[in-house]
């Protein structure tokens, strides 16, 4: 386990290594009230002066989970008041959106969140959206993609940094991607900080939930205690390989100058 006083240092090291922030960035934080996003908020607040960050936290109410969701909203608002961080709340009807667009509620919720983050970022001239995915999320994503038959891109998992649009003016960063869930919760407990628990994460209704609650613990307990770390590390290797192959393919296509009248022409002899 990471010593309490080294926890923030480890995250800062990851931020600097991956170049997630620039000095003076305005950062939008996705704040659900769960352990991961609460940790992210508190860590970035403590690093605020080092990077000269402006911080805005956004909580999206999905229109599900009844009183539990209202509790999470109130908790998130009060936490931001305590930490003197700008707070924005957004209410939406995720079940209706899911039905309208033939999506799962999980997919619809994700769409609403990122659309909200992007909208609020543009209003404020913010260039960075920080979300709280961690190493266990990375391992779950890789396993889920493998089970769905994904190739090298799916095995790359969750990127630590990506552009939200083709323009590249807003990026999504994940400062906690190098941390285990248990380390995050341990740090919060030692800090005396409470968090909200989404009871839907405790069910096995979704594939990701079953991987989180059953498969990954089985791999860790019966095969290798560091299973999550090794899977996340492999995701990084796959990501580098995928980037290399993409760059090589792009260079090859460019050298062939093979686009003619909006059609792609490939030199078959060179491919043999």
Where are these regions (language model features)?
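ATP/NTP-dependent adenylation/nucleotidyl-transfer catalytic domains that generate, transfer
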Residues: 164, 169-170, 206-272
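Core alpha/beta nucleotide-donor-binding catalytic domains of modification enzymes
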Residues: 1-31, 35-214
């Amino acid at each position: 386990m990471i010593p309490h006083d080294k926890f923030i240092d480890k995250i800062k090291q990851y931020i600097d290594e991956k170049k997630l922030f620039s000095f003076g960035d305005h950062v939008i934080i996705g704040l659900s009230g769960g352990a991961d996003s609460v940790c992210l908020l508190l860590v970035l607040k403590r690093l605020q002066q080092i990077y000269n960050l402006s911080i805005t936290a956004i909580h999206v109410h999905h229109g599900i989970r009844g009183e539990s969701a209202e509790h999470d909203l109130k908790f998130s608002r009060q936490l931001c008041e305590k930490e003197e961080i700008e707070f924005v709340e957004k209410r939406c009807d995720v079940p209706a959106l899911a039905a309208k667009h033939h999506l799962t509620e999980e997919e619809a919720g994700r769409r609403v969140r990122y659309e909200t983050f992007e909208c609020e970022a543009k209003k404020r001239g913010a260039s960075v959206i920080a979300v709280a995915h961690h190493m266990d999320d990375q391992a779950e994503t890789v396993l889920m993609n493998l089970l769905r038959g994904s190739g090298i891109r799916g095995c790359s998992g969750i990127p630590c940094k990506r552009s939200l649009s083709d323009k590249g003016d807003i990026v999504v960063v994940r400062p906690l991607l190098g941390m285990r869930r248990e380390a995050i919760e341990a740090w919060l407990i030692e800090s005396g900080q409470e968090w909200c628990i989404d009871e839907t994460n405790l069910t096995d209704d979704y594939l990701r939930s079953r991987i989180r609650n059953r498969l990954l613990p089985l791999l860790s307990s019966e095969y290798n205690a560091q299973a999550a770390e090794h899977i996340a590390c492999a995701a990084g290797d796959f990501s580098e390989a995928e980037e290399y192959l993409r760059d090589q393919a792009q260079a090859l296509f460019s050298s062939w100058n093979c686009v003619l009248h909006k059609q792609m022409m490939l030199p078959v002899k060179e491919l043999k």
